[in-house]
Amino acid sequence: MKLILTADVDHLGAVGDTVEVKDGYGRNFLLPRGLAIVASRGAQKQADDIRRARETKAVRDLDHANELKTAIEALGPVTLPVKTAGDSGKLFGSVTAGDVVAAIKKAGGPNLDKRIVRLPKAHIKALGTHPVAVHLHPEVDVEVALEVVPQS
């Protein structure tokens, strides 16, 4: 089944891309969720317009992503105080991407979307310094040193 994506889909493509998928995936997942439309001549012209606009926007986004990268790198290590379970150094919960975004903002950094934060594992569950990747743009990634410390 040939479809045109109306939203970014992980491991498949970006908005405006024409993709070939299995019928069941297209009919049961992509189309009902509004992530794609069936490819036709009119839809293809619309996809070309979307792609041109996306390429223009990508240049502006790349400049903005580089500015954000500079601002985040200027912060240095970001500290996140959390509740711990005794002296063992384990946490009562876990540190999520939302917690990382809040810590970056509190440290004076830009407001980010939690979906662009890539934790080293699913969640951070111990004290210490952990590298956290922030995916700002397909060409721009920045690594933040997150210091998880016990709350006083």
From Swiss-Prot:
Transmembrane segments: none annotated. One of its GO terms (molecular function) is rRNA binding. GO terms for cellular component: ribonucleoprotein complex; ribosome. Keywords: Ribonucleoprotein, Ribosomal protein, RNA-binding, rRNA-binding. The keyword Transmembrane does not apply. InterPro entries: Ribosomal_bL9, Ribosomal_bL9/RNase_H1_N, Ribosomal_bL9_bac/chp, Ribosomal_bL9_C, Ribosomal_bL9_C_sf, Ribosomal_bL9_N, Ribosomal_bL9_N_sf. Coiled coil: none annotated. GO terms for biological process: translation. The keyword NAD does not apply. PANTHER family: 50S RIBOSOMAL PROTEIN L9. Binds to the 23S rRNA. Belongs to the bacterial ribosomal protein bL9 family. This is Large ribosomal subunit protein bL9.
